[in-house]
Amino acid sequence: MRDMSEAPMTWKKGGCHCGAVRFEVLAPDEIEATECTCSICRKAGYLHLIVPAPRFRLLTGENQLTTYSFNTGTAKHHFCSVCGIKSFYVPRSKPDGYSVNVRCLDEGQVRVARIALFDGKHWEEAMTTRVLDV
């Protein structure tokens, strides 16, 4: 598999189900996504693309977002208050960046080349063995 960190990047658009929240993320056409096994990601079917803050732009819907935090309170889970979809959030692993739900990107924006599994159910132990590069 080729190194995706060197691939050219363009702005990809996405959003929530109702369209009230729209964003764009700077990413290559082919990505590696992460599936986390923690309770909130598993129940939501969330598929992560974690990027540094400068590679994320909220286009519309800031006033439609509601935020949920639990456990340490570090992660800020942002949900559309109209349709309930979490299309992005500030992850505990990268509080200076964003995790975009790949499933909320507009169709045809990216191709998922690989899905890496992250044992979020055992977050602390998993973080000692895995480095999340962005």
Locate each region found by the language model.
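A short Gly-Trp-Pro
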Residues: 1-134
